[in-house]
A protein has these predicted regions:
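Sec-dependent bacterial lipoprotein signal peptides
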Residues: 1-20
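Membrane-proximal, proline-rich intrinsically disordered regions
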Residues: 20-67, 304, 380-381, 420-466
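Short, surface-exposed recognition loops and adjoining beta-strand edges that mediate ligand/DNA contacts
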Residues: 30-35, 63-71, 157-166, 170, ...
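Conserved, well-structured interaction surfaces
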Residues: 82-155, 186, 199-209, 336, ...
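Inward-facing hydrophobic residues that define packing positions of alpha-helical scaffold repeats
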Residues: 112-115, 192, 199, 243, ...
Length: 466
């Protein structure tokens, strides 16, 4: 049976972001029944489906700094941020009040609902070839896998093979019915198994190449995401295999040393660095929920700033000590470039390099990182190391430099690296009169399930300890 659906608005997202009575805090609104393959492609092409990779969890990490009082108009401080962001930054056990919406949860499940409709129905659509309909379905599978990867990394403990089968993950919904009640949380292992199943199935039906930009998925989109999934699972051999398979076809890097700040006092158009849709590094594009992500919303921490060398164009182009004509006490994050939160060449280089350093050939790890650095740092990007632990540490530092403020990848990295005492990090947020501390593996690394969702499933769903 076809699902009544508004293919123009995709879903009533304005309603979704407000209070609504549903076990998942989502509320689809039907106005039209999709019939053709083109209708279903419109659904997965909608702007709201292209947004993925929530940014607010970054405030739990060691990458960001917020002053007690905002330094200037438009910049953030503890006196100007929302109550929920302040609670995150100060590691409060409560994050959202009863009347506050958690857009990460609600928008993720809204997208999952949309993709479930497409997965279930598109092959029966009129018009369109079987190959076209299979590609649409494959992309919906990739979309669903990526949403679940973010959800399970936000609302559950990090994947640990020893405990993943017992650790509570997130509700795993694989159909288009949101009327279900009394839901339970699938285990972390179960969620990861479904993510891999979706990606494996998607790969068989997606094309190798597409015409146009990378907003639509190819086989390499599925392979690239699989590399990220296996890295999260600590399966370095499989992560390396998947990353290398994509790098063999996509090894182009943007040379940031050729770009510059063209409007030092500006915001949009401050640099001539291209957005993701015009960036040759983009393999599969998703944007952060907000137009320019965390631009002007956060200050890089001292520990992050100290990782960048002189001549590192990531610091030159994406950070500034002046904002809106005012000199600030410290650099602010102001790239004003629409970055890609899905699959890109630099992340795959870093996945492959980390896996080579752990289970592969150390010179390959260095070669990958040095190639990336040659496209990021003027004159002196090359590094020579011989000790395996030193190489691994350097790769992890490079990952932090390159992926700073990209969705909440740093939070995922902290959670996975905290499982290894060699890399465990105590996060400290220092204010004028108070310091807030988040020890390794603290339960506050895991976001709480929204309170409205818990009320609808009070007898079957467990809340995260914080």
């Amino acid at each position: 049976m076809k699902t009544t659906y508004n293919i123009i608005a995709t879903m009533a997202f304005t309603a979704l972001l407000c209070a609504c009575d549903s076990f998942l805090d989502i509320k689809p609104k039907g106005e039209r029944i999709p019939e053709t393959a083109a209708d279903y492609k419109t659904m997965i092409s909608h702007y709201e489906i292209q947004k993925m990779g929530e940014t607010y969890p970054i405030y739990l990490t060691d990458d960001c700094y917020l002053p007690d009082m905002a330094f200037s108009t438009g910049s953030q401080g503890l006196n100007t941020i929302t109550p929920s962001i302040k609670r995150l930054y100060t590691f409060d056990k409560q994050v959202f009040g009863d009347g506050e919406d958690d857009a990460f949860w609600s928008s993720s499940y809204s997208r999952i609902f949309t993709n479930n409709v497409v997965i279930r129905e598109v092959m029966d659509a009129s018009e369109g070839t079987t190959a076209e309909k299979s590609a649409i379905r494959g992309e919906a599978l990739v979309n669903r896998a990526l949403d679940y990867l973010y959800l399970v990394n936000g609302y559950a403990k990090h994947y640990n093979e020893a405990t993943a089968e017992a650790d509570a993950g997130v509700p795993l919904l694989l159909n288009a019915d949101i009327s279900q009640t009394n839901l339970t949380r699938t285990s972390v292992k179960g969620v990861y198994q479904q993510i891999l199943a979706d990606l494996n199935e998607a790969e068989t039906s997606l094309p190798e190449e597409i015409n146009g930009n990378a907003f639509h998925a190819t086989k390499d989109a599925a392979r690239g995401l699989r590399a990220r999934v296996y890295l999260c699972m600590g399966n370095y051999a499989e992560a390396l295999k998947a990353a290398n398979e994509v790098i063999a076809r996509h090894d182009t890097l943007l040379d940031l040393t050729r770009y510059e700040v063209v409007k030092p006092a500006g915001m949009i158009g401050r640099t001539n660095v291209p957005d993701a849709d015009a960036n040759p590094e983009s393999i599969f594009i998703k944007y952060a929920p907000y137009v320019f992500g965390l631009s002007s919303k956060v200050f890089p921490s001292d520990s992050l700033l100290n990782l960048y060398e002189d001549g590192d164009m990531r610091k030159v182009l994406f950070m500034a000590e002046t904002f809106r004509g005012k000199t600030l006490p410290r650099p602010i994050w102001v790239p004003y470039v629409r970055a890609n939160t899905a699959v890109s060449t630099p992340e795959l280089f870093l996945i492959a390099a980390e896996c080579e350093a752990r289970v592969g050939y150390m010179p390959h790890a260095l070669a990958l990182v040095n190639k990336l650095r040659a496209h990021r740092i003027k004159d002196k990007g090359y590094v020579s190391l011989v000790d395996k632990d030193s190489v691994l540490n350097f790769v992890l530092e490079e990952r932090r430099r390159e992926l700073a403020f990209n969705g909440f990848l740093r939070l995922i990295d902290l959670k996975r690296l905290n499982l290894d005492p060699r890399f465990a990090t105590t996060v400290k947020h220092v204010g004028d009169t108070e310091t807030w501390v988040l020890p390794p593996n603290d339960p506050r690394y895991v976001l709480p399930i929204p309170q409205r969702v818990m009320r609808f499933n009070a007898n079957t769903m467990t809340q995260n300890e914080r």
